[in-house]
Amino acid sequence: MDLTYIPEDLSSCPKFVNKILSSHQPLFSCPGDNVFGYDWSHDYPLFGNLVIMVSISHFKQLHSPTNFLILSMATTDFLLGFVIMPYSIMRSVESCWYFGDGFCKFHTSFDMMLRLTSIFHLCSIAIDRFYAVCYPLHYTTKMTNSTIKQLLAFCWSVPALFSFGLVLSEADVSGMQSYKILVACFNFCALTFNKFWGTILFTTCFFTPGSIMVGIYGKIFIVSKQHARVISHVPENTKGAVKKHLSKKKDRKAAKTLGIVMGVFLACWLPCFLAVLIDPYLDYSTPILILDLLVWLRYFNSTCNPLIHGFFNPWFQKAFKYIVSGKIFSSHSETANLFPEAH
């Protein structure tokens, strides 16, 4: 946002608001008052993540450490779509915040908490996959139910304490008198960070977990290649030839999945955190339209998560068929076999 012409006091508010309104084009253009229900960016995260939540909760065959992490992440993304995004859509459409400063602080705190929680879940899933691929014999002793509970407690509690503590204390806008004038003049409601907290947020909430994920997935990719080379020495005229084909196929799928996970993560989050880091040093000169686009780019990650971690897996596809066909309401459907190839 351009804070160059922020007035020094509230007496110049009308002139300032007219200037901003004349230069700002809303991100969405929706006729009528119903901007909640008909936008794919709001509906799909709700639907996709709800399917993941129902599938893992209902089908006992999906009760595994990895899937419990995915279930928790889907809950995070569902809450983002259900609680946060409707108000964000209204803010983007109307270019204004109508719900007061108190609810603005709750909205921005909860928004940041859920987004950071989603990132922490991605990092936890990477750790889980690391043990599953690199140390398969030790996986069941490392990734126990107790370990998963500790990871989930960390993924939820740390972002909650950080986000609500930062926003409610107004430490993120400390020393930014122009921000307070902007809120008073313009009914402004958006996450804004000063130089110190912008740097802290970039380092601890993006660079550190992102580096961990890149390192872990790089290691997984290398180990998968090593496994494939070992299996390639199995004689073709043995039963191992079939396992060789399946392992190579799984290796290619694993490499593809890893590429998609990291590609989507970096595409959705790198521009956003770069703006958080750089914008304070540019005197907040980034146009509001660009900031709006970055907000929705972050939300887009919640749309991609159920696709990457759920629907690309054949057992979730079968669970989805059970749900849409209504078979999920039949007796003993929770014990349905979603892995027929295993028998």
From Swiss-Prot:
Keyword Transmembrane: yes
Keyword terms of this UniProt record: Cell membrane, Disulfide bond, G-protein coupled receptor, Glycoprotein, Membrane, Receptor, Transducer, Transmembrane, Transmembrane helix
Family annotation (InterPro entries): GPCR_Rhodpsn, GPCR_Rhodpsn_7TM, TAAR, TAAR_fam
Cytoplasmic face residues: 57-68, 169-172, 224-257, 309-343
Disulfide bonds: C104-C189
Function: Putative olfactory receptor activated by several primary trace amines.
Protein known as: Putative trace amine-associated receptor 3
Species for this entry: Homo sapiens (Human)
Lineage: Eukaryota, Metazoa, Chordata, Craniata, Vertebrata
